[in-house]
Regions:
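Small beta-barrel nucleic-acid-binding modules, primarily SNase/OB-fold domains
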Residues: 2-163
Length: 163
């Protein structure tokens, strides 16, 4: 009983330390560590709420910007993400963390969810990001949202500058 309690406390401390990792930690260092999680809710195509050791955290998928729910493809992308993550074990690799939220790579069965979204034309890669080539390939194919004549980037829909 004592041994189990000690392991639980040590495990919780490890998860807390990972989630509290400062935003200044470099992606190489942060992405090497992952924590097991499950999905609590899919907010939209690039935002999910996960649970790690009884703690919930809102995660923005790193490297992509998916259509907002009020845009064409927004609900379809959310449905795709829901199908990918609900009821499945996730590995969350924190890149930046704040209080109860963060940016992360999310792996499902070893597959990077951000990468899948970019490959299938379901999200824009962030400008200059490593997934930019995948977005360009999807656009050339065309597939996903690139089947539309002039898809509106989500940052324009929100009235912001480029992602």
């Amino acid at each position: 009983m004592k041994f189990t309690f000690v392991l639980s406390v040590v495990g919780l401390a490890g998860v807390a330390a990972l989630l509290a990792m400062p935003a200044v930690a470099g992606p190489d260092e942060a992405e090497q560590r992952g924590v097991a999680a499950s999905c609590v809710k899919v907010v939209d195509g690039d935002t999910i709420v996960v649970k790690c050791d009884k703690r919930q955290m809102t995660i923005e998928l790193a490297g992509v910007d998916a259509p907002e729910l009020g845009q064409p493809w927004g609900k379809a992308v959310r449905s795709f993400v829901r199908e990918m993550v609900e009821g499945r074990a996730l590995e969350v690799r924190i890149i930046e963390a704040g209080d109860g939220s963060g940016t992360a790579r999310v792996l499902v069965a070893g597959q990077d969810l951000s990468r899948l979204l970019a490959e299938r034309g379901l999200a824009w890669a962030t400008a200059g990001g490593e997934l930019q080539d995948l977005t360009e390939k999807a656009k050339s194919a065309p597939c996903g949202l690139w089947l539309d004549a002039q898809p509106v980037p989500p940052w324009e829909f929100r009235g912001e500058g480029a992602a």
